[in-house]
Amino acid sequence: MVSRRNFLSGSGAALLGAALVSKAGAASLPEAPTMTTAAMQPPLVPPAGRPYTPVATLNGWSLPWRMKNGWKEFHLIAEPVVRELAPGMSAHLWGYNGQAPGPTIEAVEGDKVRIFVTNRLPEYTTVHWHGMLLPCGMDGVGGLTQPHIPPGKTFVYEFQLEKHGTFMYHPHADEMVQMAMGMMGSFIVHPKDPGVMRVDRDFVFIMSAYDIDPGSFTPRVNEMTDFNIWTWNARVFPGIDALPVRAGDRVRIRVGNLTMTNHPIHLHGYQFEVVGTDGGWIQPSARWPEVTADVAVGQMRAIEFTANRPGDWAFHCHKSHHTMNAMGHQVPNLIGVPQQDLAKRINRLVPDYMAMGSTGGSMGGMEMPLPDNTLPMMAGTGPFGALEMGGMFSVVKVREGLGRNDYRDPGWFRHPQGTVAYEYTGELPG
């Protein structure tokens, strides 16, 4: 509610601005559900009469809502959270409704949305609706378009969704700290016409990066470039879920980038089209085939392909240091350097010391003690041995016979006989 004094003084919390909720209004707030598991949740099925393909958030979930007098109401709680990045490592982050990133918000073009934001952080915050067309006073820039949301207070944002597409939300208050601590989420607006841009499977995730020293839990928020944890929805491989897909499905993957660098996102085994950008959908006549799409800072991209090639297809950022985990950074290159004598001497002081890198960086067969709360540089085991990946890596698993609404991991692909690379033992050609 806007006080008479604030209204008359033009404080920015007036009729078209994000407004403070009164005590009476707070009593009727919609529920603010929370999620603690890091597993990808089944898509939130739309109500009858509003047909669209709901999104599956990679290692995340969609926020439930309620309808009240023609408004679709959501409730976000900005709060400290603990996020498991992968088994063996957790981070103390800030997020929404129990997780970082926060839950995906889904609505339909033309919907009137009312989003309550309760601040349980130790400092003020706001929420900016990245890429959306809305009244200026709802844009969420603290000090410019609205007052900041103080700790313990609830503000409300109200606007009508003018266009469908892929958007994000994040603070515009103490932005360096709050975004570095994980405060972000996806906002998906589905077309009002169910025949527009229809797909069978629709995935979404946000890329974020953190600098967390081994043995610690809280990111270094002043870091600008030298991050050691590169995540998809605040998860790193082998903690990132697979993307299960039915053979023959038309598949969309939406990607948002709120790190401090660009990411060339590469899919094995397929050509895809970039069908959507920050500004909207791309007409079919303006698209071209790609296997790698570069996603710059602050951008959203949507790619589509038809899943007509069954298998387990790698899907990852093509910057190799973005597919490594925390222990793999700032290591000198020792390829070609004999280390046997050095290792013996160091072992007298450090019994668990293991020489690394004299023949390359492979770690598939190595085991060594790690500091508390960190991850090996490369990890994961596949059907043929060590995967040696980390960070921004997952697998698109295309399968015959997968159920229409089945998003469970189908396990490893069973290759038809004679279709796997094998050791050659014959005579080599001259």
Residue ranges of predicted features:
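Copper-binding active sites and cupredoxin-like electron-transfer domains
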Residues: V2-G430
